[in-house]
């Protein structure tokens, strides 16, 4: 299975909602195919401790494991990849240091899409499709913006930003390779059930 096939149901952690290890295990049981560790206000030691646990779980469930921003942590916990924003370490530099990592890059517009592609990103995280409480500085791209980038980009696209069970169909109709979800899964009262339901919706569009 190519890595692109595992981008379809991409869950990002947020300990404001739930414990990373608990929420990830439930999400994986429910069908999540990629996990990203995002711990913005934690120490490096904490990130490594949690990352080691998530690495074990993702291997057990045959899912991809990404670390947000932190190349050092991604390498220490033996992650499959890293996801970076436009203000983080350049994709080209990461490829020099860690050529085996899958590199995802955030793109909020065409210019950032072109930069990520030219630097050698493996996939794009495109959004915010809808307004979101989990990333308050995110710029809203909207469905039309997502469609435009999807048509022009040669890379697999993971849509992100405010995606939930009621709007995911509109996102999937844009022809993306996957959807990244935060609060709709890790903030759910029943994470397992929420993940199972989301997985069923995604499978209607991405086999």
From Swiss-Prot:
It catalyses: 2-[(2R,5Z)-2-carboxy-4-methylthiazol-5(2H)-ylidene]ethyl phosphate + 4-amino-2-methyl-5-(diphosphooxymethyl)pyrimidine + 2 H(+) = thiamine phosphate + CO2 + diphosphate; 2-(2-carboxy-4-methylthiazol-5-yl)ethyl phosphate + 4-amino-2-methyl-5-(diphosphooxymethyl)pyrimidine + 2 H(+) = thiamine phosphate + CO2 + diphosphate; 4-methyl-5-(2-phosphooxyethyl)-thiazole + 4-amino-2-methyl-5-(diphosphooxymethyl)pyrimidine + H(+) = thiamine phosphate + diphosphate. InterPro entries: Aldolase_TIM (IPR013785), ThiamineP_synth_sf (IPR036206), ThiamineP_synth_TenI (IPR022998), TMP_synthase (IPR034291). Its EC number is 2.5.1.3. Keywords: Magnesium, Metal-binding, Thiamine biosynthesis, Transferase. 4-amino-2-methyl-5-(diphosphooxymethyl)pyrimidine binds at residues 36-40, 68, 106, 135. The keyword Transferase applies. It is an enzyme of class 2 (transferase). SUPFAM superfamilies: Thiamin phosphate synthase. One of its GO terms (biological process) is thiamine biosynthetic process. Pathway: Cofactor biosynthesis; thiamine diphosphate biosynthesis; thiamine phosphate from 4-amino-2-methyl-5-diphosphomethylpyrimidine and 4-methyl-5-(2-phosphoethyl)-thiazole: step 1/1. Its cofactor is Mg(2+). Condenses 4-methyl-5-(beta-hydroxyethyl)thiazole monophosphate (THZ-P) and 2-methyl-4-amino-5-hydroxymethyl pyrimidine pyrophosphate (HMP-PP) to form thiamine monophosphate (TMP). HAMAP family: TMP_synthase. Belongs to the thiamine-phosphate synthase family. This is Thiamine-phosphate synthase. The lineage of its organism: Archaea, Methanobacteriati, Methanobacteriota, Methanomada group, Methanococci.
């Amino acid at each position: 299975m190519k890595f692109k096939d595992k981008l379809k149901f991409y869950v990002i952690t947020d300990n404001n909602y739930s414990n990373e290890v608990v929420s990830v295990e439930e999400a994986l049981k429910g069908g999540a195919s990629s996990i990203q560790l995002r711990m913005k206000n934690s120490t490096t030691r904490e990130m490594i401790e949690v990352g080691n646990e998530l690495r074990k779980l993702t291997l057990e469930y045959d899912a991809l494991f990404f670390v947000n921003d932190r190349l050092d942590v991604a390498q220490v916990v033996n992650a499959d990849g890293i996801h970076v924003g436009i203000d983080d370490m350049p994709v080209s530099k990461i490829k020099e240091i860690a050529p085996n990592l899958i590199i995802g890059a955030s793109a909020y517009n065409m210019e950032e899409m072109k930069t990520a592609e030219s630097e050698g990103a493996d996939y794009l995280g495109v959004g915010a499709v809808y307004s979101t409480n989990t990333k308050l500085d995110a710029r809203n791209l909207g469905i039309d913006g997502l469609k435009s980038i999807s048509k022009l980009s040669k890379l697999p696209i993971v849509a992100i930003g405010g995606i939930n069970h009621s709007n995911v169909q509109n996102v999937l109709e844009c022809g993306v390779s996957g959807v990244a979800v935060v609060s709709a899964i890790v903030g759910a009262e029943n994470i397992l059930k929420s993940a199972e339901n989301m997985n069923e919706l995604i499978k209607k569009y991405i086999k």
